[in-house]
Amino acid sequence: MLARVFSCAVVGLEGVIVEVEVDYTNGLPGMTIVGLPDTAVQESRERVQTAVKNAGLHFPRHRIVVNLAPAAVRKEGPAYDLPIALGVIILAGHLPHAVVDSTLVVGELSLDGVVRHTRGILPMAATARANGYKRMFVPEMDAGEAALIPDLEVIPVKSLADLYDHLAGRRLIEPYQASSSDELEPLFIPTNFSEIKGQEHVKRALEVAAAGGHNVLMVGSPGSGKTLLARAMPGILPEMSIEESLDVTRIYSIADQLPAGTPLIRHRPFRSPHHTISHAGLVGGGNIPKPGEISLAHRGVLFLDEFPEFGTRVLEVMRQPMEDKVVTISRAKGTLTFSANFQLIAAMNPCQCGYYGDSLKPCTCASAVVTKYQKRISGPLLDRIDIHIEVPRVDYEKLSGDRVGESSEAIRGRVQAARDIQKIGRAHV
């Protein structure tokens, strides 16, 4: 009788339940995996066989066929190692079939049977709960991520041997319990506005932008503080709600950029890619599309320094995501949509040498060169940037003065109040 274990695939930002069927067939001993598996899934044959033996269990001397259904969904990554191994163990008679009822299983296996980190645990856990599963076996280091989903029993698995002992009733594994220590340091620590001398009009413009969710373009000579001001922007944005935090964490989990020990991102992202980035790196892409920088900046700030130095194609592909707050990527293997509700902060020099209009250093660019440099940014893209502001050089007296500026916390309070008023206004429209 075939063994049936349930696992999960991630397609875009959503999970898809995968039924792992394991059965014997006639032929020489070995294992065949069908159901549109990629190379990593095909390689699980060797990992599973060695891990089962190293767990002290007998591996059947039969020809084993593993079917991953639905066959129309491409299966990628090593997350199917653990469910395949569990299916083999059940098929061999080491465990009854009922031990995996209402259970979702994911995890990569090492040759010694240790269960390794798997990306995309959060959307998998959300899919498990949405489909009525009561329990989920996950790698021990990913348990905090899965535990963010309520009403789902999360069992942290350290090794295949431990999982077998748990299901056999020999040594039970306690369900994971979330604690306050799960909320660790933020991914990015913004600069405090109180540490920035001068530029009061720019600070005010950024406050208005934060209150209204506007995109900003700062133009100024080198050393005027554009980067410092941009890095302070996340500090005045309102704190994320739990729904927004889960939304952001889901993207980082799928992109495998969630730091170890940080199951939930509570602070707004700040992404600052280099101007040599490709358009696929910025908006997402690849043969099997993955989130790009604009999706990793979802609910946060995307800072593009040296704005005109980005490739024309790279900048132009941002126009649709800036309007729709999502990016749709079409490939031969399918079309995926990623969230991209970011706030753009762009910075640029006024000319190629950087000192056009500077109060101290003269510009060496010809008028035609200045015009050509500024036209690297197309009109349609500039139309999507609501606030354009000049950032002049700060004079020595302000830099050396003792006056402390207003803190980010105080500004954030006004920004939050403005957004609350907007919510009330929209409710009465």
Regions found by a protein language model. Name each.
Residues 34, 40-45, 58-60, 67-77, ...:
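Basic, amphipathic alpha-helical bundle interface domains used for macromolecular binding and assembly
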